[in-house]
Amino acid sequence: MIKKYYFFLFIIGSIANAQVKILFDATKLQMAGSADWVIDADVHNLYTNNTITTTGTESNPQRVPTPAQSAITASTPESYWNGALSHWAIDCVRQGYTVETLPWNGRITYGDATNVQDLSNYKVFIVDEPNILFTATEKNAIVNFVKFGGGLMMIADHTISDRNNDGEDSLMIWNDMMTTNTVQNNPFGISFDAADISQTTTSVAILPTNQILHGPPSTITCNVCGNVTQAKWSNGTTMTLNTNANASVTGLIFKSGSSTSGITNVMCASATYQSGKVVAVGDSSIPDDGTGDPNDTLYDGYIADASGNHQKFLMNATIWLATNSTMNTHDFEATLSSLRIAPNPIANKNLKLYFSNSSNLESEFSIFDATGRLVKQFHLIDSNMQNGCQEINCQDLNSGLYFGKFQIGAAFKTISFSILN
C-alpha cells in the first residue's frame, strides 16, 4: 500500500510552545453609551457617535493592558485593569493566555502582513456588542479567520440597543456579517432574533461531554471552570439555529421552559466551521464585572449574576475556542517532526515542503486564495518525496497571498504563504 503523507505548518511557533493570544475588539464602539466592553483603558477621551473622535469621555483602550499581565497572580483583583471586561481578561491571563485589545483605530484583517494585529496572529477573537457595521473586507476577514482555524466569540444584545444612534444594533450587525459576507452565506448557522428578554433560566442542554457546559478535559487545569447550570439575561436576545446551513450548530442554553434540544429560543450556541469554532451569546452584559469607565453605571454580571455561572460559561467557552479540536500536542509531535517550508514567500512558483512522517493515515493538502476560494487540492504520497521534500507546482497560480489547509485523518491545520512572480 502506498503510504500517504500529510503535513502541518504553523502560523506562530510550534504547537507545543506557541503562546495563545486572545484579541478583544474595540473598533466597533464597544464603549459607547452605558457600555464599557473593554479589558483596560488608561485614557477616557473618546466621543462615540456615527464617527469616533478623541473629544469625549468614553474609554479609549490601548493595545496592551497596563500594568503588565506578566505580574498577574491568583490573587490579582479585577480592578488591576480598568474595563468592564477586565475580570474575564485577567482570568484568561491566569489560564496562560496573552490578551490584547484591537483599539478603536485598529484594522480587522486576515492575511494582511502590513497589519501587526492581523487576526492570523491570534487564536481567539472576542467581539462584545459591536455598534458599527463591519465593512465588506472585515466580514470576509472574520469568516476566513474562523474558516482557517480561529475561534470567534460573538456577543450580541437585545433589539433596539443601538448605543451610537446610527440605526444599527449588535444583532443586526452580526446578522449582516453572516448573510452578506462573500465567503459563505450563514456559515455558522446562527441568526440573532429581534428580541428583548430578561430572565434567569436553568434550561441547559443535556450534553454530558460538552466542554462549554462542563469545563475542559482533565488535561487542562482551570480553577474557575466547571458545570454550567443557569444563566441570567438582563435585556438580552435569543437565536434561531439553522442546521441545514451548518450541521454542527448546537444550542447550549435556552429560554426558561423551552426545549433544550431545539433550534429556537436559544440564548447561547456553538458551532464549528471548516477548521475553526464559534460561540454565540445573546446578552452583552454577562461578562460585565461591574467596574470600569467611571462615567458609566456598570453591574456585575460576571460573578454576581447566575451564582457565578457566567464566569464558568465564558471561561469554558474561551478555552474551547483556544484549543485545537481534533489533535492534541502529543499527537502532533508524534506524527510530525522537522517540518518546514522553504522559502516563504515562494520563489519561481515552486512550493517546497520539508517534513518527516511515520503515519499511515490518509492525507490531503488544499490551497485557498485570499477570498477563501479553493484553488488546488491533492494528496501527498511517499513516492513523490525526495530527501524529505515534497515539491508542489504552483505555476497555475497568480502571485499573491494563499492559505494552505493540511489534513491528516480528522486533524487539520492552516498557514498563510505568498507566491512571488
Task: Describe the function of each predicted region.
Residues 19-28, 34-38, 218-325:
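A glycine-centered loop/beta-turn motif at secondary-structure junctions
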